[in-house]
Amino acid sequence: MARTTPIELYRNIGIVAHVDAGKTTTTERILFYTGVNHKMGEVHDGAATMDWMVQEQERGITITSAATTAFWQGSTKQFPHRYRFNIIDTPGHVDFTIEVERSLRVLDGAVVVFSGADGVEPQSETVWRQANKYHVPRLAYVNKMDRQGADFLRVVAQIKQRLGHVPVPIQLAIGSEENFSGQIDLVKMKAIYWNDADQGTSYREEEIPAELRALAEEWRAHMVEAAAEANDELMNKYLEGEELSIEEIKAGLRQRTLANQIVPAVLGSSFKNKGVPLVLDAVIDYLPAPSEIPAIRGTDPDDEEKHDERHADDDEPFSALAFKIATDPFVGTLTFARVYSGVLTSGDAVLNSVKGKKERVGRMVQMHANQRDEIKEVRAGDIAALIGMKDVTTGDTLCAIDKPIILERMDFPDPVISVAVEPKTKADQEKMGIALSKLAQEDPSFRVKTDEETAQTIISGMGELHLDIIVDRMRREFGVEANIGKPQVAYRETIRNTCEIEGKFVRQSGGRGQFGHCWIRFAPADEGQEGLEFHNEVVGGVIPREFIPAIQKGIEDQMQNGVLAGYPLIGLKATVYDGSYHDVDSSEMAFKIAASMATKQLSQKGGAVLLEPVMKVEVVTPEDYMGDVMGDLNRRRGLIQGMEDTPAGKVIRAEVPLGEMFGYATDVRSMSQGRASYSMEFVRYAEVPASVAEGIVARQGR
């Protein structure tokens, strides 16, 4: 079967944004204008196509990334061919950043949606950082231009100041707030007005209003200069005072967008049906096809030092990345995969190179939100859901059996909050185990473990909302009723001092004894090093080599259980440099226990301290309540980082320990009579003040 759409006509894009910037509404409009939907769904009616989980429809937010395929030939059918869009709608709530992260990993370009009234918000900064990490070229779409306080050029300035990128407006607004009536296309230098009769599908072009002419010329000059900087040929033409043609302007802007030097900025109001078709045109003009992004890098499964790469080409060996696992009530497990190279036909066997297991692909479907169209093959650049995979988790590579490769994996953050869950009845016990393991398979930022001391099941995630939704899904999808305990903070422990400690385990009581003896030098690890950095400096065979791994294992086991209050110990450098052994009585177990005993002594000798997760908190409040809000943040051991004015009120930025933030949603609402809102995200671990740490250690009963 030949390729139906040439790869140059593909656009794999994500729609990403802050929680209320209007991302899902924008996606719904895209589906309407591209003819996938014949009727528009509205988020506030709970009818949006992309929000297909019940929880999403109830809460009016998007939790999982739904993937959809659509076609577009231009707002006035100006392109000679139909382009194929694979669109992923991502959540904007900070507890679900993991969904955004894994979407950006497999996309070629992104449309970042900002609210014209609220501008750059905390979550926009997070999304931007993630897009930088994966070098994703992007467009900025300033939405909600009909809202009170909307100001396109203010948002453009914020993108530059706060996100450190160079935005290049290619449109300007005509009117604002309730008088927002259209936009100026700076490339063509025409005013555009949308036709309400066909819900903004078509528009008419007119001359630019006289009062906006000077502003348009000023911003067009900025745009042309940005385009000219793409290459010497355009720059020379520009410097010699020649006019750049429309094609040259677009080519220059495209080249610089793909190189992540600039971000073209467009505007509109998705809800009022103004501007979305031009966003789609800009995706074609300025965002890359799969063949225009650098080849994806990977390593040889048998030799990590050996690097390899795959190009977006049907003739190269097959390779794909599984970026999401979802459970479907009708077909079981769906594995969403992005194909980077080669061709896969249903029924083929592939290798999961991360786990070293072969899998057979049963069926393949292309998703439109949660409706499915069955397909027979996928090719380089495609995004599809595979059915019948047995043992694939997020981030695994699927590849040709005879040409194995492991593609670069995704990093997932560790959870910062835990709660105990108990099934309400004995019958729920087994069902809960199955439900939690399925949910953990879908979501790498959600973890499940059993507390060894209390035998309780502990679930951990990225925030209170994240865990609420997990419990809700257990009830709805698996019929498990569960009680949940109070949230617990994921504290960590580390050491501040370098010290040398002797670990000795000797037991001689008839029969074969036990003898393990080692000297270990402990030190804080280098900045950014989380786990154990282990070195062996034993010389002269004072400890035989076969016992060294047991010493490392003893240290690692004790690190899991901590030395102060039972929290995991992180950031440790350990060097075993001396010791002794007994010909008969020494064993791996004896050395493991000796090393564990040495590690335990770090609580006194290593200056062990507790670390707590610190959150970046941003509160938006009317000025009248600002004093109360700031006083309250100070009481919560918050450090105020700064403040600024926005049309919505004062924005207060602070860093606050997570342990002080439980129940904050209720408190901030009652303080401000329901008018303040806040968002928070994890920034780093920091040392707990001694007075607070004493209480935590005492509570843990150590």
Swiss-Prot record:
CDD domains, sorted: EF-G, EFG_III, EFG_mtEFG1_IV, EFG_mtEFG_C, EFG_mtEFG_II
Chief location of this protein within or outside the cell: cytoplasm
InterPro entries (alphabetical): EFG_II (IPR041095), EFG_III (IPR009022), EFG_III/V (IPR035647), EFG_IV (IPR047872), EFG_V (IPR035649), EFG_V-like (IPR000640), EFTu-like_2 (IPR004161), G_TR_CS (IPR031157)
Keyword Nucleotide-binding listed: yes
Keyword annotations from UniProtKB, A to Z: Cytoplasm, Elongation factor, GTP-binding, Nucleotide-binding, Protein biosynthesis
Region spans: Disordered: 293-314
Amino-acid positions noted as binding GTP in the UniProt annotation, renumbered to this chain: 17-24, 89-93, 143-146
Entry's localization field: Cytoplasm
All residue ranges annotated as the tr-type G domain in the record: 8-291
An MF annotation (GO) of this entry: guanosine tetraphosphate binding
Pfam family, one: GTP_EFTU_D2
Annotated Gene3D superfamilies: 3.30.230.10, 3.30.70.240, Elongation Factor G (Translational Gtpase), domain 3 (3.30.70.870), P-loop containing nucleotide triphosphate hydrolases (3.40.50.300), Translation factors (2.40.30.10)
Example GO BP: ribosome disassembly
Tagged with keyword Nucleotide-binding: yes
One GO CC term, this protein: cytosol
Family: Belongs to the TRAFAC class translation factor GTPase superfamily. Classic translation factor GTPase family. EF-G/EF-2 subfamily.
Protein name, per record: Elongation factor G 2
Organism in which the protein naturally occurs: Pseudomonas aeruginosa (strain ATCC 15692 / DSM 22644 / CIP 104116 / JCM 14847 / LMG 12228 / 1C / PRS 101 / PAO1)
